[in-house]
Structure formats: structure tokens, C-alpha cells
């Protein structure tokens, strides 16, 4: 019986170390090396440095566009998705979420004052809301 409890305790401690909860933002370096520039070839390594644009959502008044970009860190073998907003009139782009968690599927509320999105910042993918400028994120589910 003692062996069973010991085995269970070791297993639980081991599984706890497998948690992937991130507190530090993922470092993204998408700058090309001199060799990549000189070669002028769109190699797989160069392509992995490019962000992948994902879902988009137009604001109710059509003045702003929300969209996601997934960036990759090849050294850590993982990626992260961030939410951006672009002003239609000026073309100005602002990053609304950082690289410490994956944030996806942004949607505007009816009056364009809030954004609803999915995020794994709490450890699992949940529904969140934030102000239209990216401030005051709050978990809803």
C-alpha cells in the first residue's frame, strides 16, 4: 500500500512539471540574417520568420479591423498568436495582446467598445473581453 501511495505521489509531481503555462512572453526574432538577404531565396527558414495572418473582424462602424498574426520561434519550437487592430483611415496598426499567451478569434461587441476573444493566458483556452484599445482584459469563462 505504501508503494502505491509513493508511486502516485511521484506520478503527480512528475505530471505537475509537464504544465505548459507560460508567464514570460515568447521571444520573436523575425529579422533576416545577412546570408538570407544575400541569397535572395524564399527558403523554409525565411518563411518561418514571416507572421501568419489569421482571422479578421471589421468593427461595427467599419473604421477598424481586428486580425490575428501567429509568430514562430524556431529555437523554442513553438508559436504564439497575437491580436492587432488597424485603423482604416490612417492605416495605423496597434498590437493589442503580447506574446505571453495565444489569443485568437477576436470579435467586436455591437457598439465597437469591447473585443471578445479566446485566450490561453489562464492555462486553457477561455473566453475573454478587453476594451477596444486592448486595456483591461477580463476572463469571462
What are these regions (language model features)?
Residues 14-17:
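C-terminal motif of bacterial Sec signal peptides marking the signal peptidase cleavage site
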Residues 19-21:
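Bacterial signal peptide processing site
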Residues 25, 69-82, 97-103, 118-128, ...:
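A flexible loop/linker signature enriched in serine peptidases of the S9 family
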Residues 30-53:
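A short helix->beta-strand "capping" segment at the edge of beta-propeller domains
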Residues 55, 105-107:
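Conserved beta-strand position repeated once per blade in WD40 beta-propeller domains
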Residues 62-66, 96, 112-116:
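Hydrophobic beta-strand positions that form the internal "hydrophobic ladder"
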Residues 87-91, 131-135:
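Short loop/turn segments that connect beta-strands within beta-propeller blades
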Amino acid at each position: 500500500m505504501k508503494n502505491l501511495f509513493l508511486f502516485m505521489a511521484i506520478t503527480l509531481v512528475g505530471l505537475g512539471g509537464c504544465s505548459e503555462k507560460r508567464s514570460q512572453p515568447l521571444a520573436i526574432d523575425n529579422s533576416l540574417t545577412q546570408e538570407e538577404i544575400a541569397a535572395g531565396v524564399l527558403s523554409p527558414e525565411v518563411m518561418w520568420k514571416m507572421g501568419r495572418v489569421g482571422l479578421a473582424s471589421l468593427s461595427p462602424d467599419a473604421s477598424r479591423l481586428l486580425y490575428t498574426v501567429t509568430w514562430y520561434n524556431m529555437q523554442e519550437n513553438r508559436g504564439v498568436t497575437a491580436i492587432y487592430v488597424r485603423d482604416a483611415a490612417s492605416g495605423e496598426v496597434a498590437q493589442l495582446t503580447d506574446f505571453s499567451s495565444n489569443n485568437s478569434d477576436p470579435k467586436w461587441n455591437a457598439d465597437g467598445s469591447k473585443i471578445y476573444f479566446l485566450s490561453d493566458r489562464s492555462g486553457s483556452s477561455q473566453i475573454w473581453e478587453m476594451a477596444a484599445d486592448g486595456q483591461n482584459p477580463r476572463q469571462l469563462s
